Amino acid sequence: MNKTQLLIDKLFHKMFPNWVKYLQKDLSDCKSVLDLGCGFNSFIEYCDVPYSVGIDLHEPSIEESKEKRIHNHYFKADIRTLKLKPKSFDAVIAIAVIEHMTKEEGLALIPKMERWAKKKVIISTPNGFIRHEAIHDNPLQVHVTGWDASEFGELGFKVNGMFGLKQLRGYEGYEKYKPAFLWEIISGITQYVTYHFPRLAFILYARKDKIN
């Protein structure tokens, strides 16, 4: 990306905030966050969270995340069998995680997340099934299931659409058209529509506030 593209990109994100801005806002009142399936590059890095714990089953990803000092503490564990005390964290998040699980496993995990959270639960996942193969020698990266907005709505979540129109994305979620830089901007602009109509979006952003 040249200097002109960098300048345009900077101005664009100032005019059209990406989904990380919504995550930052949702976590702004949280002092502790549990990041399930944190991976090697969690978006928590861009949030002002005093204390966070990352959990992942892929040890190389944990080690890489440790080097970046994204979380305060890390645990290698299978989130499908994880056991924690109720209300252990202000927020429990699963960013790009449940699509790597069977539907049954995902539906079993969500109520656990609600029990572990004091204030809110946040989940993001592709809208529908998106093919994705293993990366970084991590078989856990393979996509297994697809989810739609209505499923989260039935579970009491508020759902918004992120990353613009799904129709603009191709294999593994990359921009379908060229030049990718231009279509990334166009995709960002369409988020003004998909935010309110998540069924059209590439990514679903679901959140539920706990009422204690």
Identify the residue ranges that each predicted region occupies:
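N-terminal, positively charged/glycine-rich alpha-helical extensions of SAM-dependent methyltransferases
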Residues: 1-4
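S-adenosyl-L-methionine-dependent methyltransferase catalytic module, highlighting the catalytic core
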Residues: 6-9, 14-17, 80, 102-212
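Conserved SAM-binding loop
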Residues: 22-130, 206
